[in-house]
A protein has these predicted regions:
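Transmembrane helix-loop junctions in multipass membrane proteins, especially transporters and channels
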Residues: 34-45, 87-90, 128-137, 177
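Perimembrane loop-to-helix junctions flanking transmembrane segments
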Residues: 38-59
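Alpha-helical transmembrane segments and their helix-start/interface "positive-inside/aromatic belt" motifs
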Residues: 4-27, 107-110
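Hydrophobic alpha-helical transmembrane segments of integral membrane proteins
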Residues: 95-127
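Cytoplasmic juxtamembrane regions at transmembrane-helix boundaries
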Residues: 2-8, 81-105, 176-178
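Transmembrane alpha-helical segments in integral membrane proteins
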Residues: 67-90, 157-169
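Alpha-helical transmembrane segments of multi-pass integral membrane proteins
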Residues: 3, 114-178
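Alpha-helical transmembrane segments of multi-pass membrane proteins
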Residues: 21-37, 124-125
């Protein structure tokens, strides 16, 4: 491993940690706001990140819980995604990159990324439907943008995971031959 490669991996690990901490703070704030709003609905006018869902809550509590559930679940999935990325980067051995752990982590990252994408696409479609019924949904789009991009990224990561699985098979065959 060259000096530059080691530096790049350390840099990526730091960036992944920063993103992970940020996403965890966002998820925690959303969860705390949600629980607090159950006891005090007046808080709904000023949720995390200036999100105002008070009108939605007054129109339909079911829709409010559904939409907030999507917001929380997508945020939580993003936290899981970056946690898995951190585990992968911290345990990756570039001298022997084809290991069961790396293959498992890449496969898991693919599944979590696909879950984010599918959840985002479903949430987008639900928001389109409820906007036609008179709900104000303008401020919700930032919580599930790029669902299609996450699905495409999951497909690419799945291909990489498949290549790693094949690499492990070839490596074990090679070890048996020697």
């Amino acid at each position: 491993m060259t000096k530059n490669t080691g530096f790049v991996f350390k840099f990526l690990q730091v960036v992944a940690w920063i993103i992970f901490v940020g996403v965890c703070i966002e998820t925690g704030a959303l969860a705390v706001n949600f629980v607090y709003s159950l006891f005090n609905p007046l808080v709904l006018k000023n949720l995390y990140n200036k999100l105002d869902l008070s009108a939605m809550y007054e129109q339909s509590q079911f829709v409010f819980f559904l939409i907030y559930g999507f917001i929380l679940s997508i945020s939580l999935l993003k936290a899981f995604l970056f946690y898995d990325v951190i585990k992968l980067i911290s345990k990756l051995d570039l001298q022997k990159p084809f290991s069961e752990f790396v293959s498992f982590q890449i496969s898991r990252i693919s599944k979590v990324t696909l879950s984010i994408g599918i959840s985002s696409v479903i949430a987008t479609e639900i928001v389109k439907t409820i906007s036609q019924k008179g709900f104000d949904v303008n401020q919700l789009n930032e919580y599930w943008t790029d669902g299609e991009a996450f699905i495409f990224m999951a497909a690419i990561i799945f291909i990489i995971a498949t290549i790693f699985k094949r690499g492990i098979e070839l490596q074990s065959e090679n070890d048996l031959t020697v």
